[in-house]
Curated annotation (Swiss-Prot):
This is Chondroitin sulfate ABC exolyase. It comes from Proteus vulgaris. InterPro entries: Chondroitin_ABC_lyase, Chondroitin_lyas, Chondroitinase_ABC_I, Gal_mutarotase_sf_dom, Galactose-bd-like_sf, GH-type_carb-bd, Lyase_8-like_C, Lyase_8_C. Changing Y460A: Loss of activity on both chondroitin 6-sulfate and dermatan sulfate. Belongs to the polysaccharide lyase 8 family. Its EC number is 4.2.2.21. PANTHER family: CHONDROITIN SULFATE ABC EXOLYASE (PTHR37322:SF3), PTHR37322.
Length: 990
């Protein structure tokens, strides 16, 4: 490896060969290459300096940054300090022998520290060619070691962070979406404001009455057992892991070994065209933080065993202390931003658990303070002092990767009073956080949705509970337990997770950017939340959660509680723009099928696409109706061969994949991604008597010249019967066909579809149907169409592209779509589905109205009615209970024995009113914006009022807040107030 390498954006010093001739130093200051310390390779630059001495690097840097660049050019280096200094190192870039840009780096540390300073954060202003970097020593003589000096490199604007060495760097991170990773200094200062000093000069004990259970429960969760038998073979294998790390402790106490690193810090090194292959290889040669953590954790667990001999215990303890000191010396310590620290929580859990489990060993060896401080710093524990009015969301990344270790960092404080006060503050913060989720900000919504990336996101929800459930369990038998309302919210959200998933599998319509059919929710959180007891704290076991856990884990019972049957019922979750319906299978009553209808709106994004995820997912929420069979093995989804234009139930323009593929931009306040919003506010669900409905106004996006695509869509679900209506289907695309997909079903075993009574499973079958046809898919769901609609059916090998990498995929599929032709105008559709149809019987129903203003139906068996008012309108049907609505609402109604039950909701979350000017161009077309940049991201839902008119004179059975009844012309006017798109159920009598 060279000492100096010339790279695309600037030179880099690796110091592996001879002393380079580009370096000069002022008199009497010694420069040499040293093997004492190194961050890469085996050598670093050793500078023995006198006060105010200078070291000059004669390298040209071409500095030119766009004002709003997402990857500002950045200077990076690693410094090893043997002795803390009170005055800083000054670094100045010169242009024509004059200082153009400069900055300070504090030297108040020992060991390694990395600095990353964007040129735009330096003092001064300059562009163009910079000729020299002059480093000026502090006021006292000393020795510093430098390595991996990168003169200039593009770095994502979210990654450089302020820390103790360079507190002025990139203070924008304090308000970024990613602040939980990067605003470590801000959170550290919050903690310091309340605890200027922490007392480590006292004996560490963890057996005090009101806290002992927290330590015990965390250790029970982690499987710590003193009776664990450690065999000689286990010990040998474990010690071999330490040999692999090649760590050497020297007489002066310093430790050499490969650099300690983590994947997200290495990301910038892997960007194509930034570093040559040799340089990249040198930079990436490291001990990974997570691997070191895993080895330390196993050592800590072994050290808790009573079966160790004194000799073996000594061996393990030496390794444990060596590994801990190595991590700290590498710069992974309080106050250090480690150059880049984003997403490090995914790499640290084992390390921090190792320190928590080995806390008594650390205390005995004077390492409790630095390890506790590092845990507190990297988990941003200081956020427990966030002001109440600033807590507007719950970030699942925090709950998953930081919360547990925030708590454990406080449990490692030896001063009992400080620990007690800090835990009480954490309790208050956690209660508030769980109950705060404004607008489309992250966290736990009142309807059971769990938000991340400003949308209901089960893939992240499972991770949130992965970290949250053990924490709730650990705290629940102590004075620091959750409040009843916070615990209740978590229980509700967790129980909902097993409603909208099937045997832990996340439906495709809820898959976010992972439409692979492979993602599942975790089961363990149900166990730990069950063992945390009831929300009111009165019972040590939550039996509802126990029954759910037993079912999900395929056990007959758990803690003496029998497993539940799979859920049945209907649910409206309007923060997810979603209706859910489940019924027990006729073949297997313990199991239930799952139907989910879902849309999107001007508040809720319709897709999330990244460079290597969900490239073709634009239509995912265009009114999809996903039906998952009671027997999950019969599912019709296959990632291979799937036509991304044809999610079941969606109305779409069928495009070639090169046109359907997401064209990614980096928008202000966002990463490189696509998350498109609609212009419409009407999308959501309603329920009554365990039946449901869903409706939406669909509008395509002008980013892809699809602003002319519109449709009003609805589903009405009564038991196993679904009535699907569409109207106002239009667009001006004359090149491609518009279609509504009935089903797309993988048939790898040539499973049959029954069409008008005849079995079809012959490959390359292509049919055009247009006569009130009946189709039955391979799981027995019957689709019945009304006359006058053209259905295209195919049974063939289907070729597609992988959504992650565009590689070709294929599978056999049976597919049926209603064709609306090219550039349709005011088209509509009507079909019904009998899920698990009995005796090939189609649903019986009456359409009360089917036009652009209103979709309304009546189910024959239940006599229930459903109304999707897309706008204010009157009804013309003699069979309808309703006469009109003065606003866009959804209503479900049932008359029985002189009683009328209504469920009314306006699905508009109403987070803002009117149109946002910056979302439209001067022609009125929608502009792509990031939801993260919206001022209404954390807005409160505002109430909306609507009045419906019902035939006849009706009165409330009991007075109801927010419901006003008036009578006019022998009819009843009912005014309701909707907030957060939550349905209002009203009971009336004649």
């Amino acid at each position: 490896l060279p000492t100096l390498s010339h790279e695309a954006f600037g030179d880099i010093y690796l110091f592996e060969g001879e002393l380079p001739n580009t370096l000069t130093t002022s008199n009497n200051n010694q420069l040499s290459l040293s093997k004492q310390h190194a961050k890469d390779g085996e050598q670093s630059l050793k500078w023995q300096y006198q006060p105010q001495a200078t070291l000059t690097l004669n390298n040209i840097v071409n500095y030119q940054d766009d004002k709003n660049t997402a990857t500002p050019l950045t200077f990076m280096m690693w410094i090893y300090n043997e002795k803390p200094q009170s005055s800083p190192l000054t670094l100045a870039f010169k242009q024509n022998n004059k200082i153009a840009l400069s900055f300070n780096a504090e030297l108040n540390f020992t060991g390694w520290r990395g600095i990353a300073v964007p040129f735009r954060d330096m003092q001064g202003s300059a562009t163009g060619q910079l000729d020299q970097l002059v480093i000026t020593a502090p006021n006292q003589a000393g020795t510093l070691f430098f390595d991996q000096i990168i003169m200039s490199v593009p770095l994502d604007n979210r990654w450089a962070v302020p820390d103790y060495q360079t507190p002025y760097v990139n203070n924008a991170v304090n308000t970024m979406v990613s602040k939980n990773w990067s605003a470590l200094l801000m959170y550290d200062q919050m903690f310091q404001a309340h605890y200027p000093t922490l007392n480590f000069d006292t004996e560490f004990r963890d057996d005090q009455t009101e806290m002992a259970s927290i330590y015990q429960r965390f250790e029970y969760y982690q499987g710590i057992r003193s009776d664990k038998k450690i065999t000689p073979d286990m010990l040998d294998k474990h010690l071999a892991l330490w040999e692999k790390l090649v760590l050497t402790q020297h007489a002066d106490g310093s430790i050499t070994g490969k650099a300690l690193d983590h994947p997200n810090r290495q990301h910038f090194m892997k960007v194509e065209g930034v570093f040559s292959e040799g340089t990249q290889k040198a930079l990436l040669d490291a001990n990974m933080l997570r691997d070191v953590g895993k080895t330390l954790l196993q050592t800590a667990i072994y050290l808790r065993s009573d079966s160790l001999s004194a000799t073996d215990r000594k061996k393990l303890e030496e390794r444990y202390l060596l590994g801990t000191r190595y991590v700290l010396e590498q710069g992974f310590t309080r106050g250090s931003g480690y150059q880049i620290i984003t997403h490090v929580g995914y790499q640290t859990r084992e390390l921090f658990d190792a320190w928590f489990i080995g806390r008594h060993v650390l205390a005995k060896n004077n390492l409790l303070a630095p390890t506790q401080q590092a845990m507190m710093w990297y988990n941003a524990t200081g956020r427990i002092f966030e002001k109440n009015n600033e807590i507007v969301d719950a970030n699942v990344d925090i709950l998953n990767t930081q919360l547990q270790w925030m708590i454990k960092s406080l449990l490692m404080l030896p001063d009992y009073q400080q620990r007690q006060q800090a835990l009480a503050q954490l309790q208050s913060w956690l209660n508030k956080t769980i109950l705060s989720s404004k607008g489309v900000a992250g966290g736990f919504k009142s309807d059971g949705s769990i938000f991340h990336h400003s949308q209901h996101y089960p893939a992240y929800a499972k991770d949130a509970f992965g970290g949250l459930a053990p924490s709730v369990y650990a705290l629940s038998d102590s004075p620091f337990r959750l409040s009843t309302s916070a615990h209740e919210r978590l229980k509700d959200v967790l129980l909902k997770m097993r409603i909208y998933t099937k045997e832990t599998q996340i439906p495709v319509v809820l898959s976010g950017r992972h439409p692979t059919g492979l993602h599942k929710i975790g089961i363990a959180p149900f166990k730990w939340m069950a063992l945390a007891g009831t929300p009111d704290g009165k019972q040590k076991l939550d039996t509802t959660l126990s029954a759910a856990y037993a079912k999900l884990d395929n056990k007959t019972h758990f803690e003496g509680i029998n497993a539940e049957s799979e859920p049945v019922g209907a649910w409206a979750m309007n923060y997810a723009s979603m209706a859910i319906q489940r019924r027990a299978s006729t073949q297997s009553p313990q199991q239930s099928w799952l139907a989910i209808a879902r849309g999107f709106s001007r508040y809720l994004v319709g897709n999330e696409s990244y460079e290597n995820n969900n490239r073709y997912g634009r239509y995912l929420q265009y009114g999809q109706l996903e039906i998952i069979p009671a027997d999950l093995t019969q599912s019709g989804f296959s990632h291979a061969g799937w036509d991304w234009n044809r999610y079941p139930g969606t109305t779409t323009i069928h495009l070639p994949y090169n046109e359907l593929e997401a064209k990614l931009n980096q928008l202000p306040a966002a990463g490189i991604e696509e998350m498109l919003l609609s212009t419409e506010s009407y999308s959501g669900a309603n329920t009554l008597n365990n039946n449901s409905m869903f409706a939406m106004k669909l509008h395509g996006h002008s980013k892809y010249q699809q602003q002319s695509l519109r449709a009003n869509k609805s589903y009405f679900l009564f038991d196993n019967r679904v009535i699907a209506l569409g109207s106002g289907i239009e667009n001006d695309d004359k090149q491609h066909t518009t279609e509504t997909t009935l089903f797309q079903f993988a048939v790898p075993k040539l499973q049959s579809v029954i069409i008008n009574g005849k079995k079809v499973n012959q490959l390359d079958t292509q049919l055009t149907l247009n006569n009130a046809d009946t189709l039955i898919d391979p799981t027995g769901n019957l689709y019945k169409l009304t006359k006058g609609q053209t259905v295209k059916f195919s049974y063939q090998k289907q070729h597609s592209l992988d959504d992650r990498n565009s590689k070709p995929t294929e599978q056999l599929f049976a597919t049926a779509v209603i064709s609306h032709g090219k550039a349709p105008s005011n088209e509509n559709y009507e079909y019904a589905i009998a899920i698990e149809a009995q005796n090939n019987k189609a649903p019986e129903y009456t359409v009360l109205q089917h036009n652009d203003q209103l979709h309304a139906v009546k189910d024959k068996i239940t006599q229930e009615e459903g109304y999707a008012f897309f706008e204010a309108t009157k009804l013309k049907s003699a069979d309808a209970t309703l006469l009109s609505s003065d606003a866009p609402v959804m209503v479900m109604a049932k008359i029985q024995n002189q009683q009328l039950t209504l469920s009314i909701v306006n699905p508009d979350l109403n987070l803002y009113q009117g149109r946002e000017k910056d979302q439209f161009d001067d022609k009125g077309n929608q502009i792509e914006v990031s939801v993260y940049s919206r001022h209404w991201l954390t807005a409160e839902s505002q109430s909306t009022n609507s009045t419906i008119t019902v035939k006849g004179i009706w009165k409330l059975t009991t007075p109801q807040p927010g419901v006003i009844i008036k009578h006019h012309n022998n009819n009843t006017l009912i005014t309701t107030t909707t907030i957060q798109a939550t349905p209002t159920v009203i009971n009336l009598v004649k």
